[in-house]
């Protein structure tokens, strides 16, 4: 220490009113200050989570995705809004594509193909790739036309709920994702008398025989659905795909084949023969659908250059790169491309979707610092920052890494949140005595009508009143903060609300539009929502989550221009939204990866543990998938807790848009679905955590913030302190809800 060259050479100036200034004459060469000297010339990379995994690092020398050179080049990697980064990583490895819903993939590619042919006078038909595309497009349409009637038949015959178990096809499709392999393997097991989906010791020989039966008769139908079929099944395939009227239907041919191929020692299926035949036909069609989806997607790029076809959102463009697939662990149930039949029996219809599961995407977030450690590459230091990413009950937001630092809110900010309020004010109109329900309205048309009714109820006075609810609330706001945010369930709902305000009321409104779309007459692109205070609009309508983070809407005084937030609909994703089930699967998979089962014990059975892991993942999947997502219908506590925790975090984030600059905000919850019993003046029973997402969120937050007591272990005490710091103010908002 005495021999340092800077000893006794520091000049300290403490004559001013500020903190003393230290001037070091050797700062330019001091090794302790090397990092400080590099800051002005440091190279900074800025990337979105999707670009980090999908965009090639060009024009840099690396011919790979940015996440790989980041391991070699970066000293520090900062992931802001880490929970959103985690969600983006998940999406990169889980692709969901509706096929037969309105504007589904199948209709988009068919429309683009035929319009392209018409524009080019059918010139592509003279090209080899054009003919091949036409061939597979015809295969795809025929496969859909063959499978969909079998699935819709289950609806018309009432094959739902427990009744689906009497029809093997209904049982398999209700379990969750299925494929040609799934259907034909289940058929092989059923032919051998195996009814349970769990392998039992006394039936192990039957399972082996069923697998051998599958590989003997059905494997070629799945592995190469457009190749030469097995000799015994050639008549069935020819009948299914024939271009002329055949003497027998495909189901009749399938029944005949099954009758002549009953496994040795097994009884005749009897009354279930027709049921098994439908599964055989459905398995063949399913294998053809997944194969044609892949082939058509693969051919789209070359076809676009040939005929200038419209971009139909090629699903191959959304798939992770091979170098990342080599690193990311598989899903516990295995990586797969499968079909998902989501039934809506009330409306006698359903949607056939394609799911492509490629791995546990959030694993990358946990390993950004050592992604290439197995190759001897020391990765960057990683800083994950987020205000809502530590809640073990949440599937979408929780990052299972103990925080090392918590930045507390300033006292002024905490006071602003304590002064803020949540108001439950269900809106009523003639014909809506129980309150207007937007969430759960049922069907696109009914929900759009409910959005218009709700918007009207907020923007026009009640019978006998002089002012509307919106006018009353804005009149009580600060003069420079008299703007409101309307929160809807979707971009379409937000557009409907804004259009109604502008055309049917005196309220001026804009609605948030995704950046990839033209804004239109009343639209405001997402990247420009910070400009909302500079427009002449009083209200901005946005889909839930789109205005929750990333953009501040400030007035000329630098504080939030929005003082009132109106939730037109209850916090609830659409029934067919798969993001929540996939988040639960990923959260459970990550738990297993962070806490693996060690098989170093001589008595440990690694194979059995793997079977249990895969079975548990499939059980979770089948619990959530194959039926519309519904809060009140969830029976499993872990699913309800995850759902409620996710919605509470989203509410907290959106509320923050009105808190910028340490000013309070008023949040009005208008949908009767928030608390159905409280919304109905004739119902005297209180809402519970089973009927109201608000009550469930309040009770769950209280449970999380409860003091574990002095006898609790240190980890429990530490978690309590973290939860109090992160979620304590949300707990205050929920505890002080004004129920009206």
Where are these regions (language model features)?
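Conserved Walker A/P-loop ATP-binding site and its immediately adjacent core
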Residues: 1-5, 10, 50-54, 85-89, ...
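Conserved interdomain hinge at the start of the Helicase C-terminal
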Residues: 373-378, 424-500
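Low-complexity, highly charged intrinsically disordered N-terminal segments
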Residues: 1-12, 266-345, 349
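Conserved motor-coupling elements within RecA-like helicase/translocase cores
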Residues: 33-45, 503-542, 553-556
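Cysteine-cluster motifs in flexible loop/terminal segments that predominantly coordinate metals
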Residues: 1-40
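Extended, charge-rich low-complexity regions and/or helical-solenoid scaffolds
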Residues: 483-521, 558-567, 572-576, 581-592
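The feature captures the C-terminal accessory region of ATP-dependent helicases
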Residues: 502, 631-633, 646, 652, ...
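Signature of the SF2 helicase/ATPase Hel1-core->accessory helical subdomain module
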Residues: 26-43, 47-294, 354-357, 362-363, ...
